[in-house]
From Swiss-Prot:
It catalyses: (6R)-5,10-methylene-5,6,7,8-tetrahydrofolate + NADP(+) = (6R)-5,10-methenyltetrahydrofolate + NADPH; (6R)-5,10-methenyltetrahydrofolate + H2O = (6R)-10-formyltetrahydrofolate + H(+). NADP(+) binds at G166, A167, S168, I232. This is Bifunctional protein FolD. GO terms for molecular function: methenyltetrahydrofolate cyclohydrolase activity; methylenetetrahydrofolate dehydrogenase (NADP+) activity. The gene is folD. Keywords: Amino-acid biosynthesis, Histidine biosynthesis, Hydrolase, Methionine biosynthesis, Multifunctional enzyme, NADP, One-carbon metabolism, Oxidoreductase, Purine biosynthesis. It comes from Haemophilus influenzae (strain ATCC 51907 / DSM 11121 / KW20 / Rd). One of its GO terms (biological process) is purine nucleotide biosynthetic process.
């Protein structure tokens, strides 16, 4: 059985078209456009690509993006001062600081300084805490995007065994909270987990977010599972995920491709969060 492909490219286009319609409606009513501040420190090539994609998406949907391209030598206090300015700026609804940051800057301190109502990445402890308490507002973009992809399958997640490979603050941990909220039974695996294969074989829903090419053998996939591959790795000039795609697709019912799966959804949910922050910016 060949798995159905869950296209993040297609779904993200639909989401962004819907957001663009809403923003056009606000502007026609004489309101200002939503504003997103995008901060990049240093010249990491991957970060530059990600930031470029985010700015391009802002243009597509009608969000005004304000760019801050700062040198690698920027100090923590300099960055905190910019965040304080943006927190006070009534025309800025969302603040995004592209990670990773240079070693002289403490990422946690930066994230905590952002006004939780403008934390469109969904990383602030306040917003993660709200998700944990089952009252989410601004949600981490990648896990939120994964939930939207899972919705397209029509599968009821209640009682399904969801296995997450990777326990990062950006994907794995908030992903576990999203799946719990949806009624799944959740197992989170990480670098100290013994017998990873055994856990993966039990997964009705498998979400992999580690950043190691072909970490998950296609043979491990349970028949008719849903496989969400968050990993993005470059191998021999090609982008590949964390899951051995071809073999996994023979056993799974649904699978996301890399590229064109989770990546576009992360950016779409950032746009969605920015509109949400705009609508609630009082």
């Amino acid at each position: 059985m060949a798995a159905k492909i869950i296209s993040g490219t297609e779904l993200s286009k639909q989401i962004k078209a819907n957001l663009a319609d809403k923003i056009t409606h606000y502007i026609e009513q004489g309101k200002r456009a939503p504003g997103l501040a995008v901060i990049l420190v240093g010249a990491d090539p991957a970060s530059q690509i990600y930031v470029g994609n985010k700015r391009k998406s802002c243009e597509e949907v009608g969000i005004l993006s304000k760019s801050y391209d700062l040198p690698e030598t920027t100090t923590q206090n300099e960055l905190l001062a910019i965040i304080d300015q943006l927190n006070a700026d009534k025309n800025i609804d969302g603040i995004l600081v592209q990670l990773p940051l240079p070693k002289q800057i403490n990422a946690e301190a930066i994230i905590e300084r952002i006004d939780p109502k403008k934390d469109v990445d969904g990383f602030h402890p306040y917003n993660v805490g709200r998700l944990c308490q089952r009252i989410p507002t601004l949600r981490a973009c990648t896990p939120y995007g994964v939930m939207k992809l899972l919705e397209t399958t029509g599968i009821d997640l209640h009682g399904k065994h969801a296995v997450i490979v990777g326990a990062s603050n950006i994907v794995g941990r908030p992903m576990s909270l999203e799946l719990l909220l949806a009624g799944a039974t959740v197992t989170v695996t990480h670098r100290f987990t013994k017998n990873l294969e055994n856990h993966v074989r039990q997964a009705d829903i498998l979400v992999v977010a580690v950043g190691k090419p072909n970490l998950i053998s296609g043979d491990w996939i349970k028949e008719s599972a849903v496989v969400i591959d968050v990993g993005i790795n470059r191998v021999d000039g090609k982008l590949v995920g964390d899951v051995e795609f071809d073999k996994a697709a023979e056993k799974a019912a649904y699978i996301t491709p890399v590229p064109g799966g989770v990546g576009p959804m992360t950016v779409a949910m950032l746009m969605s969060n920015t509109l949400y922050a705009y609508e609630h910016n009082k």
